[in-house]
Amino acid sequence: ADDRNPLEEFRENNYEEFL
């Protein structure tokens, strides 16, 4: 994740929830 890409970081932090 990157501070310039909050959506990408959100996806990484919530990957299991998205499954």
UniProtKB/Swiss-Prot annotation:
It is found in: Secreted. Expressed by the venom gland. One of its GO terms (cellular component) is extracellular region. It comes from the Eukaryota. Its EC number is 1.4.3.2. Keywords: Antibiotic, Antimicrobial, Apoptosis, Cytolysis, Disulfide bond, FAD, Flavoprotein, Glycoprotein, Hemolysis, Hemostasis impairing toxin, Oxidoreductase, Secreted, Toxin. Its cofactor is FAD. Its main location: secreted. GO terms for molecular function: L-amino-acid oxidase activity; toxin activity. Contains 2 disulfide bonds. N-glycosylated. It is an enzyme of class 1 (oxidoreductase). It catalyses: an L-alpha-amino acid + O2 + H2O = a 2-oxocarboxylate + H2O2 + NH4(+). GO terms for biological process: apoptotic process; defense response to bacterium; killing of cells of another organism. The keyword Phosphoprotein does not apply. The keyword Disulfide bond applies. Belongs to the flavin monoamine oxidase family. FIG1 subfamily. Catalyzes an oxidative deamination of predominantly hydrophobic and aromatic L-amino acids, thus producing hydrogen peroxide that may contribute to the diverse toxic effects of this enzyme. Exhibits diverse biological activities, such as hemorrhage, hemolysis, edema, apoptosis of vascular endothelial cells or tumor cell lines, antibacterial and antiparasitic activities, as well as regulation of platelet aggregation. Its effect on platelets is controversial, since it either induces aggregation or inhibits agonist-induced aggregation. Homodimer; non-covalently linked. This is L-amino-acid oxidase ACTX-8. It comes from Deinagkistrodon acutus (Hundred-pace snake).
